[in-house]
Amino acid sequence: MQVTVNEHDAVERVATATPAGNREAHAHGTDKLAIEGGRRLAGEIAVSGAKNAALPILCAGLLSAEPVRLDNVPDLKDVRTTLALLGQMGMREETDGARVVLDASRVDNPVAPYELVKTMRASILVLGPLLARFGYAKVSLPGGCAIGARPVDQHIKGLQAMGAEIHIEHGYIEARAKRLSGARIVTDMITVTGTENLLMAATLADGETVIENAAREPEVTDLAHLLVAMGAKIDGIGTDRLVIQGVERLHGATHAVIPDRIEAGTFLCAVAAAGGDVTLTGMRAHILDAVIDKLREAGATIDEGVDTLRVRMDGRPSAVAIRTSEYPAFPTDMQAQFMALNAVAQGAAQVTETIFENRFMHVQELNRLGANIAVDGNTALVTGVPKLSGASVMATDLRASASLVIAGLCAQGETLVERIYHLDRGYDRMETKLTAVGANVRRISGSEA
């Protein structure tokens, strides 16, 4: 099976990971969501900035000594952890709502310690920028969600091709280079974080770097657009072949993070499963084509505006087969949500996961709610049932938790989703947004439970 490093995943924010600024600490590790199912959803939901674009973009702030101003930054646990990590290196940061201003002029500690990196795989994204600008980086090997092997060897191989001297010992990657040199890099697999790390490193390298088999995800493209705004020279943006002409230095820039296509897809899926009429605002439909096509196949009516998406659904959805693959195909980060949709659909459908092994941990929990799902290797057969029944379930990772929320919206009675710190890593106030469109969802804090 092909394993792709495809998502900037993290697990739990540690106590030290709340940065300066006015971003509040979110959920306690024992928070739960209580969902009373059976309500139609109607109204408007504003889509937040994309987590998987914001994390590399924050790390790109290391590449310049001038301020980088970012808008539409989501207020998420992973973002706060990244800001804490950057702050420990000497990065100064000012936050005002969804605007973050980064100043890396005084960065003097190019080390990413285990205490922070263990909570978030995306921490590896500091490796390329630190090495390119400072000639040295010491980064702990990452932790993250338990959804399969997501190796960092492609990052290391690419940086070595650019002349870096890299040693791994005592759980740390230690990298040195006087100045990186341009190189032709062919990754063994499509890796999103690998592409981003090598792209950032190449912007300050001496000469031309070509990245073949590059990831084409919109989040990679968004990072590239910021880098160009900072003075980088990049050709082939949005394709699988990136050509970068290194420059001596990058300057400051202003950039708005793209909308979160996975958050948008999750809400579209929720409406398609539970029924209703909801308009998503601040969303670009073209980055969600594969998901929209499948929702239409399931029976949803979706109208695309300039920056809006309206989804309407009456009656039960029809079962739809999905197969995950790299962008622009169906995203692995929407697989669990479609599993919940298929659980209440008419008919049966096969769900095939080609990106990660071990990404069916939500199946057992969905079956606790009355779903009929059988797993065979990397394929699940979902046979729809007329009704799910509320029960206590446990989130195992970020997207699995979203699938349990969708299932809870469709279930009779109360569903209690435990361990929602996973949800808070990737969704900005999900329960608040769902409540605003008529769902009966409330957070039970750890102190109440």
Curated annotation (Swiss-Prot):
Active site: C145 (proton donor)
Sequence positions bearing 2-(S-cysteinyl)pyruvic acid O-phosphothioketal: C145
Renumbered residue ranges of the record's region Disordered: 1-30
Domain of life: Bacteria
SUPFAM superfamilies cross-referenced by the UniProt entry: EPT/RTPC-like
UniProt xrefs under Gene3D superfamilies: Enolpyruvate transferase domain
InterPro entries documented for this protein: Enolpyruvate_Tfrase_dom, Enolpyruvate_Tfrase_sf, MurA_subfamily, RNA3'P_cycl/enolpyr_Trfase_a/b, UDP_GlcNAc_COvinyl_MurA
Subcellular location: Cytoplasm
GO molecular function, one term: UDP-N-acetylglucosamine 1-carboxyvinyltransferase activity
Binding locations of phosphoenolpyruvate: K51, N52
Annotated residues for binding of UDP-N-acetyl-alpha-D-glucosamine: R121, R150, P151, V152, D153, Q154, D333, I355
The enzyme's E.C. designation: 2.5.1.7
GO cellular component, one term: cytoplasm
Biased composition (Basic and acidic residues): 1-12
CDD domains registered for this protein in UniProt: UdpNAET
GO biological process entries: cell division; cell wall organization; peptidoglycan biosynthetic process; regulation of cell shape; UDP-N-acetylgalactosamine biosynthetic process
Keywords per UniProt: Cell cycle, Cell division, Cell shape, Cell wall biogenesis/degradation, Cytoplasm, Peptidoglycan synthesis, Pyruvate, Transferase
Pathway connected to this protein: Cell wall biogenesis; peptidoglycan biosynthesis
Family membership noted in the UniProt record: Belongs to the EPSP synthase family. MurA subfamily.
Task of the protein: Cell wall formation. Adds enolpyruvyl to UDP-N-acetylglucosamine.
NCBIfam families: murA, PRK09369.1
Protein name, UniProt field: UDP-N-acetylglucosamine 1-carboxyvinyltransferase
